[in-house]
Structure formats: C-alpha cells, structure tokens
Amino acid sequence: MHRIAVPAATGAPTAQEPVKVAARNLDFYYDKYHALKSINIEIPEKRVTALIGPSGCGKSTLLRIFNRIYALYPKMEARGEVLLDNENILSPKYPMNRLRSKVGMVFQKPVPFPMTIFENVAYGIRHHEKLSKADMQNRVEQALRQGALWDEVKDKLGQSALGLSGGQQQRLCIARAVALRPDVLLLDEPTSALDPISTSRIEQLVEELKRDYTIVIVTHNMQQAARVSDYTAFMYLGDLIEHDRTETIFSQPSKQQTEDYITGRFG
C-alpha cells in the first residue's frame, strides 16, 4: 500500500491548541442543492490546515464560507455558525468590512489588479485605514517582504503588476492579502496554475507565514498537503469524513474512506 511521506508531527493535538475558527453544525445550500452537511471543525491558531478531497466534495465551498464571499451571489445560504474568535461571522450583525480585514483570501488563479505593483498592495489598505505616505510605503514594503517578493520588485514598484510572472503574481496576491494584517489567510489551490519552482516557493512561503497567520489551504495535491500542513481534513460529498493531524491522516487514518482516498483507490 502506498503511503505519502509526511514530516514528524509538531505541537499539541487540536484540542490543546487555541482555536481560531470553528464551524458548528454548518450546512450550506446552492439554491436547493445541499452542498455541505452538518460540518463541525475547529481550525487551530497559527497552524496550517489543509482541506483535501475529490472535486465537488465541498472543500472550496467551506473555504468561501469562512469569509462569506458566497454572499456576493444569489440563492446561496449558510446555516449554523462559523466562529472567528468566538464571534459568529454568519450573523447579519457581523460587519463585512471587519470580516474582510480579518480574513484574507488568495485564489487558484493569480488575479493582480490592472495597476502598479505598489497600488496592488496599497489598494486594500486605503479602503480600511488612513496612513501617511511614509507609513503606506513602509506597510507596502512589509507586505511585499512577507510575500517573499520585495527583492524582486523593489526597483519597479511603479510598473504594472500584469508584467510579473505567474509565480510572482501569486506572491503579489499573497502580499496584498497580508497587507491588511488579517488573522486568517485562506488559500484556494494557490499553486495549481504554477510551475514546480514557483510551487516550491509558495510552499516555503506558507511555512513562513504560519508564524503570524492561521492558514487554511485547499489542495488537490496530497503530497502538498503532507508537506505544508499541520492538520488535514478529508471531505467527501459534502461531509467532513475525518480531521486530524496531517501525520495521522496520511499514516494511520481512522476511516476507511480516508484511507481509500489517500491511497488512490478513488478520487
């Protein structure tokens, strides 16, 4: 039986770590289609949690609920609770601007804005804070450093972001997300459109970013989940089948469905 090699586990089990995000009895509907079914999961603070499962299992849907991006589209409904620092972000009383500043998101395909590299990073900050020119410059530099991009673009901040390579554009999107200093960073298959070298750089970056951020990453690449995550959740047909330490999921899963998936018997 083929097993994916994983690093040795570090830190304490989920139950002993501070919980940053928690879904409680979460159901989600696309019109009448029941996409997520009574999901209960706790995301530990300043750890990387990977969501894995076959296409259509609900992992990207769950990710989008964590920042309520689904609310931009009609006929979508979430029921239950998603707690961020023990506050229910699904409540109509939870301010959307506050949520956007606390939960950043990076998508599968890099989406730089058609503006300069500097303005790409400054854009979100301007909508949430009023900074002096010097403070803005410092903030943009800090974000680009966190995105591991500063050394490559520091002399061309006034150039269009559209001229960057795909890997650079994705790191710019990460820098743009962390520029607001969120608590949580959501990554939806952030390397699926990138070459192996760019993928490796993003994975290294994820490892660095978890010192400051709680990270949830959706990936179809189980080797990637094994490399970058501390915890892994396996989803199938809208159900959360198993959630545990990554080392446990890939070496001693408790559910047969999980074992069948990670050993390539389906999916």
Curated annotation (Swiss-Prot):
**UniProt entry keywords in alphabetical sequence:** ATP-binding, Cell inner membrane, Cell membrane, Membrane, Nucleotide-binding, Phosphate transport, Translocase, Transport
Major localisation: membrane
What Gene3D superfamilies does this protein map onto?
A: P-loop containing nucleotide triphosphate hydrolases
SMART domains attached to this UniProt entry: AAA (SM00382)
Which residues are involved in binding ATP?
G53, P54, S55, G56, C57, G58, K59, S60
Which Pfam families does the entry mention? ABC_tran (PF00005)
Q: Where in the cell is it found?
A: Cell inner membrane
Q: Which GO terms describe its molecular function?
A: ATP binding; ATP hydrolysis activity; ATPase-coupled phosphate ion transmembrane transporter activity
The protein, known as:
Phosphate import ATP-binding protein PstB
Name the source organism. Xanthomonas euvesicatoria pv. vesicatoria (strain 85-10) (Xanthomonas campestris pv. vesicatoria)
